[in-house]
Amino acid sequence: MQFTKLFILTFFFVFTAKPLLAHQSECQEQLNSNFNRPCLERLIPRSLDPLNRNMMQPSVVKVSNQYSVSGSLTEDNQPLIVVIGASGRTGRFVLESLAKRDLRIRALSRNIAKASADIGGNYEWVYADVTQPETLVMALQDSDIIISTIGAKPGKGPDGPESVVYKGVINLVDEAKRAGTRHIIYMSSIGAGGAENFSTVFLNLFMNKTLKWKSLGEEYIRNSGIDFTLVRPGGLYGDPGTQGIKFDQGDKIIGSIPRGDVASVLVESVYNPDAINKTFEIINDESLPVDAWKDEFKNLKTGEYGKIQSGRLPFSYWGSMLILVLLIVLLIRRRRRRKRAA
């Protein structure tokens, strides 16, 4: 009798808990007619609904038409490229790659004296911290393109994922709109669009929901009205330029890639018009030619980015765990019956 009650309760929970755990979503209206994108379903975290819902509702503004409609550049122009996170391990490779082209470069860091001394180069170093929006006003002034390689440290606090890759991204995007920035190239990570991948669930559970905050930061950029390129690299390590680079969408692949290769893709996104308004993953693939990746941008689709993170354990995992518990209970009961019968 007790087992029957347990089964009924489990069945009720599995088939009724989904709407209780689910998040609300709604279509983000595209007010800018210059950006023809399909309706994007925007996640509305319940934790923000009663507090400050407008944090997930960036006002869509019209971007200046001073440049070409496609948003691409030719190397005859000298746009101002702002690199945020320039003194980081990936940001340094970005600066090195940009320095090979005829560009104006502004490097942002939270410790410009140390960064300038360690990295050198003919860069305009400016102090900026995405968690302090007032520091972004001068840092982004007159910027044409932003390349962001910012990352968060594990844990909570001012350097944690929520503060840096979510709220910090909101600060960055809002100031970029005021500054008239026309293209944001943002380094995210694989897993930000894989809502039910095991690795994503694991990192969200044990790394302070890192991928949830990255996913929501990505969505804020997508809904900003500014041209964007969201690059999701795999694990970062190794020497650049030794293997081919595989492009994919929908957050269905896993792998690794050197920081130097990631920087090359970020910088190429400045010039390639096929990179505009795309979200994609990149990993190394030894079966591909080393330089063939530059032709992959044209195969990417807009509006393809996987699933937006909620940070909660997916319903399928809850159901699987409950069924597993039920089976374990059933096995225990059978063993006890056999012992009694013996």
List the predicted regions and their residue ranges:
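Active-site-lining helix/loop region of Rossmann-like oxidoreductase modules
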Residues: 86, 238-323, 327-341
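Non-catalytic, hydrophobic alpha-helical segments
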Residues: 90, 146, 221, 231, ...
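NAD(P)-cofactor binding segment of oxidoreductase domains
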Residues: 145-148, 153-184, 215-220
